[in-house]
């Protein structure tokens, strides 16, 4: 028995560990360190219809317990992803999750329709929540009606299941999650980065050229855990949890909150072996905690609470 195997809509994962979109590129750099086939899946870098060159520099700033980034969805565009990046990834035993972005609904639909045809793309992740793009993105992720409409439109053209990535920069994430689930989403991924800023001590000006950026890393983990805990009790679709994961213990905590798989982001920049290390350490941790299979951990925090009542 594979104690780590997870079955999700469109995704048969040998383990629940997935590098997060934007922190792993298309895997080429990390393939120099280890066989990517050990991973559960890969969330590839966000793809837009046309190439994007991203925001001006500086784009990254360190913070205590994390980092700020304002990359601006830099990517080679749909045509190159379809003709170069995805074919290259076919050498690995991996179901690919393609992250789709755009400035208007028509952009998402156009990319989703084409990229979902790729043989190794098993699911889409709609990036409706990126906080560092001047147009699009953030508007979709903060309005329940707009988010639901976009989900429906993409579902109509996609040949694979659709997961929607939620923004934490909202007043009521449960309301948005419910709207997206009711619109037919197959799953949710959460959370994206928190909007933040750093100021230069000498100039008193923002360090990032974009002024604001997305905060990621261990600093946001408690926020992510709380939001996964709330949303998982409100919807009946699976959640891929993310936000500050660095260890096998972090993975179990997300499962306890209600996640069915996890994505590892910023930690890949610090340690390129972080994902295979977590995969190797999970079985021993399951033994220590008394679980036969990782699925036994899913939702344990609130399921225990409900049972005790």
Curated annotation (Swiss-Prot):
Belongs to the dihydroorotate dehydrogenase family. Type 1 subfamily. Its EC number is 1.3.1.14. Catalyzes the conversion of dihydroorotate to orotate with NAD(+) as electron acceptor. The active site is at residue 130. SUPFAM superfamilies: FMN-linked oxidoreductases (SSF51395). Substrate binds at residues 45, 69-73, 127, 192-193. This is Dihydroorotate dehydrogenase B (NAD(+)), catalytic subunit. Pathway: Pyrimidine metabolism; UMP biosynthesis via de novo pathway; orotate from (S)-dihydroorotate (NAD(+) route): step 1/1. GO terms for molecular function: dihydroorotate dehydrogenase (NAD+) activity. GO terms for biological process: 'de novo' pyrimidine nucleobase biosynthetic process; 'de novo' UMP biosynthetic process. It comes from Bacillus thuringiensis (strain Al Hakam). Heterotetramer of 2 PyrK and 2 PyrD type B subunits. The gene is pyrD. Binds 1 FMN per subunit. InterPro entries: Aldolase_TIM, DHO_dehydrogenase, DHOD_1B, Dihydroorotate_DH_1, Dihydroorotate_DH_1_2, Dihydroorotate_DH_cat, Dihydroorotate_DH_CS, Dihydroorotate_DH_I. It catalyses: (S)-dihydroorotate + NAD(+) = orotate + NADH + H(+). Keywords: Cytoplasm, Flavoprotein, FMN, NAD, Oxidoreductase, Pyrimidine biosynthesis. It is an enzyme of class 1 (oxidoreductase). GO terms for cellular component: cytoplasm. FMN binds at residues 21, 45-46, 99, 127, 165, 191, 217, 243-244, 265-266. It is found in: Cytoplasm. Its cofactor is FMN.
